[in-house]
Amino acid sequence: MIASCLCYLLLPATRLFRALSDAFFTCRKNVLLANSSSPQVEGDFAMAPRGPEQEECEGLLQQWREEGLSQVLSTASEGPLIDKGLAQSSLALLMDNPGEENAASEDRWSSRQLSDLRAAENLDEPFPEMLGEEPLLEVEGVEGSMWAAIPMQSEPQYADCAALPVGALATEQWEEDPAVLAWSIAPEPVPQEEASIWPFEGLGQLQPPAVEIPYHEILWREWEDFSTQPDAQGLKAGDGPQFQFTLMSYNILAQDLMQQSSELYLHCHPDILNWNYRFVNLMQEFQHWDPDILCLQEVQEDHYWEQLEPSLRMMGFTCFYKRRTGCKTDGCAVCYKPTRFRLLCASPVEYFRPGLELLNRDNVGLVLLLQPLVPEGLGQVSVAPLCVANTHILYNPRRGDVKLAQMAILLAEVDKVARLSDGSHCPIILCGDLNSVPDSPLYNFIRDGELQYHGMPAWKVSGQEDFSHQLYQRKLQAPLWPSSLGITDCCQYVTSCHPKRSERRKYGRDFLLRFRFCSIACQRPVGLVLMEGVTDTKPERPAGWAESVLEEDASELEPAFSRTVGTIQHCLHLTSVYTHFLPQRGRPEVTTMPLGLGMTVDYIFFSAESCENGNRTDHRLYRDGTLKLLGRLSLLSEEILWAANGLPNPFCSSDHLCLLASFGMEVTAP
């Protein structure tokens, strides 16, 4: 009985005493560790061999990690390591505890900690102030792009891993892999002006090149000389005396339009999109190529009158400008040097026609008739006039019907201005941004002079995009434009294709015979002398003769024009200066890159009859007339423009490339 009582009473008391002694030991040890500054204890203790006594030490260490880590770090940052006397006295208090069963293991642990504290005094590297606030390592990859190293954790993570000494942790921190440092994105968002990526749909984000782009080398354009190359007839373009001149066509990108479609220019640095920067670049480009005729599109009105026109006037140009109708702020301009040409007439063209749904857009054109000025050294010679047309056609890829109608109006105006007294045409140059790709129906219509459009999907006219997947497509119907427009299906004004009527009306014999027995003709005039056999008889009206004479229908006097069914034509015989293909690279030519997709939409057409030459590639595919192509500035491929970060860029300040060609006109004796 007594033994049972002792068993039930003494055993819990023993366990309680042991728990109190453990708590006292833990408290003493926490005080010591709280005043310690070296986490080397953690590293050595973590690497100690495991044993029965080690399990309790590991539990105490885990509690120290959870409760006293922040205090250890703060204490370490405030002062130097603790002195050895304090460490030895603290260890002595722990060693004098008679109730601790694992005193031997504690003795070994204390000895190791004391040696570690002595070794910590000889450390050369100071303890970092805050492990979690190390500065980010910034790596400059490309100009304008900032890349930073991976940020360190705010608190060291010790769970489920062996602890490392502070020295090892600091060393590993500064010896990070360079590849990781170079390609780890900083958590801070990169400003838009420092971004240098191409967010084009379907192309992902392209990293900018790591070196500075040599724009002058990448965008170098060769001059192609045709003056010694024979044409289809075997004649060289440079034979005989000629009046030579150069013409440039350039869409210079209106600032207002750029700001309205800013999503198209996210790949550009904001500085190169500034108008003042772009204006200087454009003027330098004009001065470098020094054309005799300059045809510009997307010319903003205020920039034209305030900067462009005065600057071009100082360069020796005379300029004509036509702003787009409606509330649009840009337009077209044609400039020429008065030392080379004399103006005969200028005709602005508006495509907007009130009341016609087909022609409700604000695009415009400009047609000039220029007389070349022959140098005095050539003597008494003459040169035919030159007709120059500049336009910017509607962009909308789905409205090919509008594009064709606008082009028909421009061709009718060119036909009227360029028509000579004998019915032929003087040399013609038609240029501008036509918003159509090569070999599209609109392009073929200009080059071939004929197009069968009836039933054609409207999106197919320009070839810019493929909308064949759409169920309901707008198709072209005949006639394409109403007769009230006053333009025939041959793209001529009705008043131009028929001879002008004289103010005096002319009547035929049959019409005049209607008045033979009218009432006034059957009355004897007063005072008429009676002459036998001549005036003595009264005219007798035949039976059934109408007394009243019907007037001739006015519509019969007006010449009527017939409409062809689904076909439009023109007789200007135009061909393109460019072939739209780069044989050296095996790539198509590119004049612009909307949304990162290179295409040709800018053209220079001139008067020259196209012809077929089979497989002969050494001759040009047209016959030279009065106007001869002497040379052109080569275009670039899409890959080259991609290498230059697209358009615009610091070297080219427009989203289009300029087109430049040299021509020669025959000089004849008067």
From Swiss-Prot:
Annotated GO CC locations: cis-Golgi network; cytosol; endoplasmic reticulum; mitochondrial outer membrane; nucleus; perinuclear region of cytoplasm
GO molecular-function term, one example from the UniProt record: catalytic activity
Keywords tagged on the record: Phosphoprotein
Transmembrane segments: none
Residue(s) carrying Phosphoserine: S77, S105
Record's keyword annotation contains Phosphoprotein: yes
Tree of life domain: Eukaryota
One family name in Pfam for this protein: Exo_endo_phos
Record-annotated disulphide pairs: none
Stated family: Belongs to the CCR4/nocturin family.
Protein name: Protein angel homolog 1
Source organism of this protein record: Homo sapiens
Lineage: Eukaryota, Metazoa, Chordata, Craniata, Vertebrata
